[in-house]
Design a protein with these regions (language model features):
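HotDog/MaoC-like acyl-thioester-processing domains
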Residues: 1-16, 146-151
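Active-site-proximal structural scaffolding
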Residues: 1-2, 61, 97
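Hydrophobic residues positioned within well-ordered beta-strands of beta-sheet architectures
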Residues: 2-4, 64-66, 102, 134-136
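Sparse, context-dependent recognition of short Cys/His-centered cofactor- or disulfide-binding micro-motifs
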Residues: 4, 51-53, 64, 87-89, ...
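Short intrinsically disordered coil segments
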Residues: 4, 21-24, 34, 119-122, ...
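Active-site/ligand-binding surface loops and adjacent short beta/alpha elements
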Residues: 7-81
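Active-site pocket scaffolds in enzymes
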Residues: 73-151
Length: 151
């Protein structure tokens, strides 16, 4: 499995940040994430004893877009990737009092363990001396109009 794990934190990430992903379906990874499914895209204030929530995103498009924008500082970020290269995408939401972060993770398989990945025939393998190129594009925004036009 190959994965990019990009953490977004303060000052870009606050309870006033907007979050957008162009997925058609959001699937909770576990029981804890099911509790937060209705608020998967809402940032909240740092919360004592917050339990992490992870969500898988599925796409109907070849280009995935994950975006965070903070209107208070007029800054934002967009992470784009080809959904054929990265057929899975995990959103890690941790709104804890000391651990306040949003992890955005394009990956080649889900994170439910090698045994499950092999069973579902999702594992990417390379032969000896074989290579594969992957790309993820990151764009930074300086105002709301850039954010809106990037959606």
């Amino acid at each position: 499995m190959y994965m990019y794990h990009m953490n977004i934190g303060y000052p870009l990430l606050t309870e006033n940040s907007e979050f957008y992903i162009n997925s058609y379906e959001v699937v909770p990874r576990d029981e804890e994430a099911k509790k937060g499914l209705a608020q998967w895209n809402q940032m909240i204030p740092p919360t004592p004893n917050f339990a992490e929530q992870c969500f898988y995103h599925h796409y109907h498009t070849d280009l995935a877009k994950m975006m965070v924008y903070n209107k208070d500082i007029e800054k934002g970020i967009q992470i784009c990737f080809d959904t054929k290269e990265f057929p899975q995408n995990l959103q890690w939401k941790m709104m804890g009092e000391r651990d306040y972060v949003l992890g955005l993770e394009p990956c080649t398989a889900d994170l439910d363990g090698r045994h499950t990945i092999k069973k579902n025939s999702e594992i990417l393998t390379l032969e000896p001396a074989e290579s594969k190129d992957f790309s993820v594009n990151v764009h930074l925004f300086n105002d709301k109009s850039q954010w809106e036009s990037a959606k």
